[in-house]
Amino acid sequence: MRSYIKVLTMCFLGLILFVPTALADNSVKRVGGSNRYGTAVQISKQMYSTASTAVIVGGSSYADAISAAPLAYQKNAPLLYTNSDKLSYETKTRLKEMQTKNVIIVGGTPAVSSNTANQIKSLGISIKRIAGSNRYDTAARVAKAMGATSKAVILNGFLYADAPAVIPYAAKNGYPILFTNKTSINSATTSVIKDKGISSTVVVGGTGSISNTVYNKLPSPTRISGSNRYELAANIVQKLNLSTSTVYVSNGFSYPDSIAGATLAAKKKQSLILTNGENLSTGARKIIGSKNMSNFMIIGNTPAVSTKVANQLKNPVVGETIFIDPGHGDQDSGAIGNGLLEKEVNLDIAKRVNTKLNASGALPVLSRSNDTFYSLQERVNKAASAQADLFLSIHANANDSSSPNGSETYYDTTYQAANSKRLAEQIQPKLAANLGTRDRGVKTAAFYVIKYSKMPSVLVETAFITNASDASKLKQAVYKDKAAQAIHDGTVSYYR
């Protein structure tokens, strides 16, 4: 983009828009143990110093654990796990610490053996077992042991990932969790719905989990679904309007951790979302951004939920939708000089910014990812359609003379003037420092994409293509990466 084009009226109007208070990193804590038994124990310590009653399920009996979770909440009891044939050491120790007098075992002897039950009894603890002939029957019997209610949550009894996010809702409202399969309703479920006078149901999962045929047979059903387990969990939080002042985060494939963690979320009257263990899932990012979540408790130690995910949650850019617009494209090459086409430099740097922001937990969106042309208005429209929180326009500079050099960042005063200025002020010094270029400062100009974009917006001029020294840097991957790092770091600093 040529400098003489940029000789536009510079706007030095008073900036009256609100500048957000500087933010700190998000709060991230973690609770976990060396295994599923230890993690459940550590979770219980977040809720109880003593507990007269505890609920115990088999460590691999996920359906039993799901149906038991609302019962545990209602009994003011922790949910603990055990090995099938021997009382787990961690659980045994915890029962003693809590001075527990009564244990409710949920599940039959294949899940928690008679020998294990006897080991619990030997601690001077009274035992009650709730068990049915199958998971449907066990869930129905748990429902009967709970208080009166007219609503139930319905899940596919084999799709465990559908359950954790809805457990806090079911538990705190006293709703039992009942099971069905995709194409039919088990007789035990039908009977308990009738016996308890259930008149409305929340059906969790799409038609791949519970068919419309089953759905239509349930009393006054409402369905919550998602394209995957992460989106489903996010949709549960969104549609049920669960509290998010503290959000519990668990690996979507670590069912024991997720279910036990959900009981903690229920006790604290908060919500739980799911993530991939190695990288914060898109579904989690979206709900974090839309709900402005900033306090997190991770369920499970590494590797269940990696340090990378913890760092993403901590980063204030997490969940923010950042629109990245590499200028020019296709027939519009932009500036040309020293063997460089501006459109190619812009795209290279933009892709690097995209990668870095994605790694930090943001939701970056590129206006183009290849040599494609979009009009300026199309770029503005794309950012609006993406509901972007920020707009980053990336360019390289040029002049008729080869002398001008350096880096500069522009903002416009039409919309979000103060916030745009602040964003530019965070990016510009980092850009000049990283590239070792002349710092030409932060300036105002009515460039189309930043003038007509309604979110905070900046146009970054990385360096001059027409200057030999600047161009030599724009030819090198290491410097293009440094430019991208500066734009990333400035964006993160804006949120701090």
From Swiss-Prot:
Organism superkingdom: Bacteria
Reactions accelerated catalytically: Hydrolyzes the link between N-acetylmuramoyl residues and L-amino acid residues in certain cell-wall glycopeptides
One Pfam family from the record: CW_binding_2
GO terms of biological process kind: cell wall organization; peptidoglycan catabolic process
Start-end of each Sequence repeat: 30-128, 129-222, 223-318
CDD domains reported for this sequence: MurNAc-LAA
SUPFAM superfamilies: Zn-dependent exopeptidases
Induction text: Expressed under the control of SigD (major), the transcripts being predominants at the exponential growth phase, and SigA (minor). Repressed by LytR and YvrH.
Localization (cell): Secreted, Cell wall
Region (3 X tandem repeats): 30-318
Entry GO terms, CC: extracellular region
Domain MurNAc-LAA: 322-490
Family membership noted in the UniProt record: Belongs to the N-acetylmuramoyl-L-alanine amidase 3 family.
Its job: Autolysins are cell wall hydrolases involved in some important biological processes such as cell separation, cell-wall turnover, competence for genetic transformation, formation of the flagella - in particular of its basal body - and sporulation. Has a high affinity for teichoic acid-endowed peptidoglycan. LytC is required for efficient swarming motility but not at the level of cell separation or flagellum biosynthesis. Rather, LytC appears to be important for proper flagellar function.
The protein, known as: N-acetylmuramoyl-L-alanine amidase LytC
Organism of provenance: Bacillus subtilis (strain 168)
Lineage: Bacteria, Bacillati, Bacillota, Bacilli, Bacillales
Gene coding for it: lytC
